[in-house]
From Swiss-Prot:
This is Probable phosphoketolase. It holds the Pfam family XFP_C. It comes from Rhodopseudomonas palustris (strain HaA2). InterPro entries: Phosphoketolase (IPR023962), THDP-binding (IPR029061), Transketo_C/PFOR_II (IPR009014), Xul5P/Fru6P_PKetolase (IPR005593), Xul5P/Fru6P_PKetolase_C (IPR018969), Xul5P/Fru6P_PKetolase_CS (IPR019790), Xul5P/Fru6P_PKetolase_N (IPR018970), Xul5P/Fru6P_PKetolase_ThDP_BS (IPR019789). Its EC number is 4.1.2.-. It comes from the Bacteria.
Length: 784
């Protein structure tokens, strides 16, 4: 048996664990009689029982042991819970530490506070059942499983003094995101970063099935962890005293290994990738709960997952619950007033050393603004609209290079992407930093190193999870990805947006840096990769979330992209989605005009318009390729109908299309009508799926006259122009749409339609013969 714990300390830690377990069960079951000062009655029990018991005792056990480690070694540590359905445990521990009452003074540290604590859990207008933003010390709700370890590593990057204890549920370990997250240790630099201590909580069962990792041999499991690059330390048992001693010894060993790895790297330099420790904790699911209910085994089975005892119409169940609660001996844990006994409370760390009060778990408290160069200095010089071509993301890459350079000292900015930084033309950043890499490096490798700040791994899950963990602990970042494949993290985006929305209502949660997406290699320039790479639907997905959280930008050129990116990097508590092309495209606005345009969100391009306030048609566009096609259509219309009056409206901030009552960026009705008129036809060329524009504008006065072209799920490996043709977004179709909708041109519709189909036939014959677009497309340029 380990001599890490004296018998007295072990007894006190066991009592602390009992207290956390008691509070956890009380939250799930009780609405009254919190100290069992009366015999338990049916009216003391909640009418609806919600919560998850099975994982909770293991989480509570680990919490008290980590507290011992923090106190004895003066550690800076946070606690990430993969199985976040163990929410009552984390609420219980933050209450025992006092931080819960500090955040919520009504939840006093006495009998009344206990009753409120119990009653509010999973109660209408109370607190959620998981480790939600309302829980002090949480940066990871753990409702949707799979992201704990990625968040933990994200939190550890650039936090050299921080240790992140990450509890990985054995059910969670079956998810794809978690399975690849073990590889994060190939990106953690012990000289510069903090440490992650993964603890695999092997309690054996999910909701109704065994877990895979619990049903393979110990040798196979430890070999798996060693294959991932960890040194596993196994703790197992179902006798509390033995487990207390074994777990204390395991944690001491793990800490010693972490400190030795860091000391070697920080004094001798990084010479090789270390083998970091991890712990496998095998204890029964629902440990310390009822052994059996109605003759069926509960503890150590899947039946312990949620609410082990239900149906309290049976008086025997009330008695069984009381026996369970009294097994924790609450009279030994709380005084007559319901206060946690001082000799037990003294086991917890104090102040910011408490995991539930650590400022890293409320990252806005630590957030420092980025040092940003003046983005105007990176502008594409332009003598007139359409006078030059440029790669928008390459211009952005030069700007990001200097953002990276100017924040090297503060170490609070990283760029994330799934092996696409160079492909997306952002490789300018590699002039000032490497791609982070702790695995082997060969002669053919370029810009890999242990001190890099560009995070590339071919897992969108890891990129997203790392970035979220980095942001939630008070830093800044940007995630660059191919547009079609960002859908891989649709659900992760959901969870982060929900987190931000919840935080808006929690006064003590300080704002964090926004999560910034740059989607490029987009649908209209994936002609070379084909249909699988063509999907602009992430825009729709983002727009579903709360208007207080989401922003969507479609800059039409490089200078607008620079303005938008600067704005997004300065923003707080949003998810900013930027969609921009990487291929050479015509540039439209000089930097001053771009700033004005982006500030407005949408505007009339007077240099492309000739309506004198009374247009025949409004040609609207959002997105770089739709903008090109719209302007080309304008030229065609002027050729076809010399006296036509056209207004060109470009939208860069998609959310301005909504009314101001629906989104803070929304245009009021008067301003919207000034742009789009109240009664004239609007032909809207949109980057994404066309129905989104209808959805955003359906309450507008002129909605009936808005006709939208966009992606309609047609694509292949073809030419760039054929992509827009396949989806009826090409200039010829847009021009025909305008003619069909202008009443005074009704007599030209038939001839215009014939001309359109003749052009389409010529286009198809040409690309079939030459494998490239027609010269009039390739060589087109704007002429006023």
């Amino acid at each position: 048996m380990s001599d890490v714990l004296s018998n007295d300390l072990m007894q006190k830690m066991d009592a602390y664990w009992r207290a956390a377990n008691y509070l956890s069960v009380g939250q799930i079951y009780l609405q009254d009689n919190p100290l069992l000062e009366q015999p338990l009655q049916l009216e003391h029990i909640k009418p609806r029982l919600l919560g998850h018991w099975g994982t909770t005792p293991g989480l509570n056990l680990l919490y008290v042991h980590l507290n011992r480690l923090i106190t004895e070694h003066d550690l800076d540590m946070i606690y990430i819970i993969g199985p976040g359905h163990g929410g009552p445990g984390l609420v219980a521990n933050s209450y025992l530490e006092g931080s819960y009452t500090e955040r919520y003074p009504a939840i006093e540290r006495n009998r009344n506070g206990l009753q409120r604590l119990f009653r509010q859990f999973s109660w209408p207008h109370g607190v959620p059942s998981h480790v939600s933003p309302e829980t002090p010390g949480s940066i990871h709700e753990g409702g949707e499983l799979g992201y704990s370890l990625a968040h933990a590593y994200g939190a550890a990057f650039d936090n050299p003094d921080l240790i992140v204890a990450c509890i990985v549920g054995d059910g969670e370990a079956e998810t794809g995101a978690l399975a690849t997250s073990w590889h994060s240790n190939k990106f953690l630099n012990p000289a510069r970063d903090g440490a992650v201590l993964p603890i695999l909580h092997l309690n054996g069962f999910k909701i109704a099935n065994p877990t895979v990792l619990a049903r393979i041999s110990r040798q196979e499991l430890t070999d798996l962890m060693r294959g991932y690059g960890y040194e596993p330390i196994v703790v197992e048992g179902d006798e509390p005293a033995l487990v207390h001693h074994a777990l204390a010894a395991a944690l001491d060993r793990a800490l010693a290994d972490i400190q030795a790895i860091q000391a070697a790297a920080r004094h001798q330099g990084v010479t090789a990738r270390p083998r970091w420790p991890m712990i496998i904790l095998r204890t029964p699911k629902g440990w310390t709960g009822p052994k059996q209910v109605d003759g069926k085994q509960v503890e150590g089975t899947w039946r312990a997952h949620q609410v082990p005892i239900a149906d309290f119409k049976d008086p025997a169940h009330v008695q069984l619950l009381e026996t369970w609660l009294r097994s924790y001996r609450p009279e030994e844990l709380f005084d007559a007033n319901g206060k946690f006994r001082d000799e037990l409370a003294a086991l917890a760390p104090t102040g910011h050393c408490r995991m539930s009060a650590n400022p890293h778990a409320n990252g806005g408290e630590l957030l420092q603004p980025l040092s940003l160069p003046d983005f105007r200095n990176y502008a594409v010089a332009l003598s007139a609209p359409g006078a030059a071509k440029a790669e928008a993301t390459r211009a952005l890459g030069t700007f990001l290079r200097d953002v990276m350079r100017d924040n090297l000292e503060t170490k609070n900015f990283r760029l994330f992407g799934p092996d696409e930084t160079a492909s997306n033309r952002l490789d300018g950043v590699l002039e000032v930093t490497d791609k982070q890499w702790m695995a082997d490096i060969e002669d053919v490798d370029i810009a890999l190193g242990p001190d890099g700040r560009v995070m590339e791994v071919l897992s969108e899950h890891l990129c997203q999870g790392w970035l979220e963990g980095y942001l939630l602990t008070g830093r800044h970042g940007l995630f660059s990805c191919y547009e079609a494949f960002i859908h891989i993290i649709d659900s992760m985006f959901n969870q982060h947006a929900k987190w931000l929305k919840a935080c808006d209502a929690i006064p003590w949660r300080r704002p964090i840096a926004s999560l910034n997406y740059l989607l490029t290699s987009h649908v209209w320039r994936q002609d070379h990769n084909g249909f699988s790479h063509q999907d602009p639907g992430f825009i729709d997905h983002v727009v579903n979330k709360k208007a207080s959280v989401v922003r969507v930008y479609l800059p039409p050129d490089a200078n607008c992209l620079l303005s938008v990116a600067d704005h997004c990097l300065r923003s707080r508590n949003y998810v900013n989605l930027i969609v921009a092309g990487k291929q050479p495209e015509w540039q439209w606005l000089d930097i001053d005009a771009a700033v004005r345009h982006c500030t407005a969100g949408a505007g009339i391009w007077h240099w492309a318009s000739n309506d004198d306030g009374d247009p025949d048609v409004v040609m609207a566009c959002a997105g770089d390729v739709p903008t090109v096609e719209t302007l080309a259509a304008v030229m065609l219309l002027r050729e076809y109908v010399p006296d036509i009056r056209i207004r060109v409206v470009n939208v860069v901030d998609l959310m301005v299309l909504q009314p101001s009552s629906e989104h803070p960026h929304g245009l009021d009705d008067r301003r919207f009508d000034e742009l789009f008129t109240v009664d004239k036809p609007v032909v809207f060329a949109f980057h994404g799926y066309p129905w989104l524009i209808h959805r955003l504008t359906y309450r507008r006065r002129n909605h009936f006259n808005i006709h939208v072209r966009g992606y309609k799920e047609e694509g292949s490996t073809t030419t760039p122009f054929d992509m827009v043709v396949l989806n009826d977004l090409d200039r010829y179709r847009l021009a025909l749409d305008a003619i069909r909708r202008i009443p005074r041109l009704a007599g030209q519709v038939e001839s215009a339609t014939d001309r359109y189909w003749a052009t389409m036939q010529r286009h198809k014959l040409y690309i079939g013969e030459h494998g490239d677009d027609m010269p009039e497309i390739r060589d087109w340029r704007w002429q006023a």
